[in-house]
Amino acid sequence: MQAIIQLRGPVNMSGAVEDTLAMLNLHRVNHCALVPETETYRGMITKVNEYVAHGEPSVEVLSTVLERRVESENSDETVDETWLEAHTEYDDFDALATALIEEETTLRDQGLSPVLRLHPPRGGHRGQKHPTAEGGQIGVHDTDQINELLEAMR
């Protein structure tokens, strides 16, 4: 499972990239989507690589982000562990995060919004417009790097 975070806005973005971001449920900057690791999604991520940060997060960090940022798909109810127990197959955020990483379920299957609306990173971006190879935030991240970014945006 990959976490994809849109970091750049729509200025000078081609229509094909904009459509691909929409297919990934990324409509605004600082939104995050969780997608399975399939060939189709790999191609989509490659196409939008200059506008997003992506990588596989750890269970602990994903659990923290879900606890703070997950929303119900159909209502304005606050999602907490009580809500999770009553409306999903999982008792807590750790179990949900584990199932998401192992690709056993999706947020939408559990009645949750497929988009996590994140806070801008505390402390700012490290060279937002540059690829990770040049010390920036755009592109592929290893687990530690994506965890650091998600923690800053929790």
Swiss-Prot record:
SUPFAM superfamilies: Ribosomal protein L30p/L7e. It holds the Pfam family Ribosomal_L30. GO terms for biological process: maturation of LSU-rRNA from tricistronic rRNA transcript (SSU-rRNA, 5.8S rRNA, LSU-rRNA); translation. The keyword Metal-binding does not apply. Residues 119-129 have a biased composition (Basic residues). GO terms for cellular component: cytosolic large ribosomal subunit. Residues 114-139 are annotated as: Disordered. The keyword Ribonucleoprotein applies. One of its GO terms (molecular function) is RNA binding. Keywords: Ribonucleoprotein, Ribosomal protein. Belongs to the universal ribosomal protein uL30 family. Part of the 50S ribosomal subunit. This is Large ribosomal subunit protein uL30. The gene is rpl30.
